[in-house]
């Protein structure tokens, strides 16, 4: 069962470049359907792992990586597709934070203080808000509703502020005495 659950997570990773290509080639309906499917894989891999007590170390590592890959592919795709400096600018903070946190997790693991970089509730909200923002942009593109793009910008700004704050929080936590 563990292997099957990990395959669900890997499917989400494989969906990221496909969704990106659908976005770049203006196939918004397929894009939003695949994005929804990616969201379902995120839900079901966690649900099945808990239900069947099949949580694994590789699954713990793959799941957040799959989220980050999906988010990065789509933020880059959206910044290109919408020709948006704002999305590109905010994405640079999100991507830099994710790289920094990966380095912090590696460092804390080597120092045997990995408990200091456990995922926080606010970090889960951050990921959810990032994904919601992306979904909102995709929906706006699908129905050609420009006002929703502005609303999505606001959600992404809030997500980025939380992203920066949680990065700061993790950094303080790792280097506290």
Placement of each model-derived feature along the sequence:
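Membrane-helix interface segments
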Residues: 3, 26-30, 54-58, 83-87, ...
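Residue-level signature of the transmembrane alpha-helical core
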Residues: 10-13, 33-36, 65, 92-95, ...
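Transmembrane helix-loop junctions in multipass membrane proteins, especially transporters and channels
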Residues: 24-28, 51, 82-83, 106, ...
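Interhelical loop and helix-boundary elements at the membrane-water interface
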Residues: 1-9, 47-65, 107-129, 173-177
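Core segments of transmembrane alpha-helices
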Residues: 11-17, 64-75, 97, 101-102, ...
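Multi-pass membrane catalytic core of lipid/isoprenoid biosynthesis enzymes
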Residues: 51-106
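Topogenic membrane-insertion module of multi-pass membrane proteins
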Residues: 1-44, 127-147, 158-177
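Hydrophobic core segments of alpha-helical transmembrane domains in multi-pass membrane proteins
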Residues: 31-38, 88-98, 153-159
């Amino acid at each position: 069962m563990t292997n099957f659950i990990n395959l669900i997570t890997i499917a989400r990773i494989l969906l990221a470049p496909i969704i990106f290509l659908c976005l770049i080639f203006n196939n918004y309906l397929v894009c939003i359907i695949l994005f929804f499917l990616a969201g379902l894989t995120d839900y079901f891999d966690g649900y099945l792992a808990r239900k069947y007590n099949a949580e694994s170390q590789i699954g713990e590592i793959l799941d957040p990586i799959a989220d980050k890959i999906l988010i990065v592919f789509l933020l880059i795709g959206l910044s290109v597709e919408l020709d948006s400096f704002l999305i590109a600018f905010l994405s640079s903070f999100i991507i830099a934070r994710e790289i920094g946190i990966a380095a912090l997790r590696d460092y804390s693991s080597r120092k045997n203080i990995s408990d200091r970089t456990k995922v926080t509730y606010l970090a889960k909200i951050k990921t959810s808000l990032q994904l919601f923002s992306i979904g909102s942009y995709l929906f706006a593109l699908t129905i050609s509703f420009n006002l929703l793009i502005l609303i999505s910008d606001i959600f992404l700004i809030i997500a980025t502020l939380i992203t920066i704050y949680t990065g700061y929080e993790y950094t303080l936590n790792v280097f506290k005495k």
